[in-house]
């Protein structure tokens, strides 16, 4: 495990629920923020549906997948997900704040060197660094906490 400061990261991966408007908005904002540090970002958004909504189109930093792209063992059937898993991101941000076996599967299989996310979930042991959320806190507080600590870790 190699903990890395966000300012020193070259590549950051983010997994999130694309069908969660708050998650989508926060991830898009954070990607813009990281680009100011010249950090390359790749996000993978999951839609619990058979098809992507018409208004969703993959872009340079944004890939998506849907329920039908997985088999019953949650093994991916599309190259975008496999490429994301195989990319050794300096930091992988898991945005799940509730149990989500699909996104946790991606995090578990990821080749990233430093995986961060929320504590207290069933598979939090797959993460190298976690943030404890208080009752009623959600993704906004997780992202704020992670950003704060990722700026403090291994500060030069």
Language-model features: locations:
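Short N-terminal or domain-adjacent regulatory/targeting segments
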Residues: 1-11, 21-24
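Residues at the starts of beta-strands that form the adenosine-phosphate
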Residues: 11, 39-42, 114
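Structural beta-sheet core signal
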Residues: 14, 43-45, 117
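Histidine-anchored nucleotide/phosphate-binding helix
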Residues: 20-39
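Active-site and donor-binding regions of nucleotide-sugar-utilizing enzymes
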Residues: 69-133
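Active-site-proximal region of nucleotide-activated glycan assembly enzymes
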Residues: 125-156
């Amino acid at each position: 495990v190699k903990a890395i400061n966000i300012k020193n990261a070259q590549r950051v991966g983010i997994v999130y629920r694309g069908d969660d408007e708050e998650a989508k908005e926060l991830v898009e904002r954070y990607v813009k923020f990281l680009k100011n540090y010249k950090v390359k970002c790749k996000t993978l958004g999951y839609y619990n549906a058979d098809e992507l909504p018409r208004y969703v189109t993959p872009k340079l930093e944004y890939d998506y997948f849907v329920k039908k792209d997985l088999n019953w063992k949650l093994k991916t059937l599309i190259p975008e997900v496999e490429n994301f898993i195989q990319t050794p991101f300096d930091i992988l941000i898991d945005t799940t704040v509730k149990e989500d076996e699909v996104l946790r599967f991606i995090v578990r299989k990821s080749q990233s060197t430093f995986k961060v996310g929320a504590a207290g979930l069933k598979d939090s042991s797959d993460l190298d660094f976690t943030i404890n959320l208080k009752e009623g806190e959600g993704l906004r507080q997780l992202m704020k906490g992670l950003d704060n600590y990722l700026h403090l870790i291994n500060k030069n």
